[in-house]
Amino acid sequence: MINHDLALALCGAGHGPFVDKIASRAWDALRGVADIVEASNAVESMIKETYQEFGQIYQPGSFPEAELIYGITIGGQSKLFQACGPIVLEKSYASSGIGHYLADFLAERMGANGEHGWLTTRQCVAVAAYILFQAKEHVEGCGGNSHIAVLREAESSGMVEHELVEHLTEHLKLADRFTGELLLDTADFSMSDSALAEKIESSVGL
């Protein structure tokens, strides 16, 4: 959701209708906010109020589970949050859903969890496409189309075009196969250095 210099991206896991309800209320909560602090507080308050409201309807122990990851950018500043139920925490990296273990592993391996410096926006999009591809390939229950949103502080925010996501995914599938072969080749001490270098060069050329 975008409005001038204010943008919100939100995804969720768990009880679908409840996630949709919070998502539909998130943008309304941001109306009239002036800065990132007001925006952050507004969405957090909305989440807590929604849980309080529906908590009076559901029987004890039957309340639907939902996890949210959302980002906000306004006035040249941005923040990322993760909400586990009504508990909201600010994050530099977050994952959720049944594929989050695989996502965390791949993000750490590719330096995308913020612990070893920061990636460029293009690199983050590539990592996101790769994680989604791997999750859909290897985690039961993960599927559907891949959707990637980018929030920018100095430029326009929005969704990455579906065609680009598909192109990235196909390219990463090919690169992933060759990367696996290279890992095996580097452990093959019978292969000469020149042969290994040639294999690496041909793979990079792809």
Name the predicted role of every residue range.
Residues 127-133:
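A conserved acidic, glycine/proline-rich C-terminal tail/linker
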Residues 1-64, 87-126, 140, 159-206:
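Conserved short S/T/G-enriched processing/targeting/catalytic segments and their helical context
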Residues 71-97:
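A mid-sequence, solvent-exposed acidic-amphipathic segment
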Residues 66-73, 79-80, 124, 144-153, ...:
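Short beta-strand scaffold segments in enzyme catalytic cores
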Residues 133-140:
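Short arginine-rich
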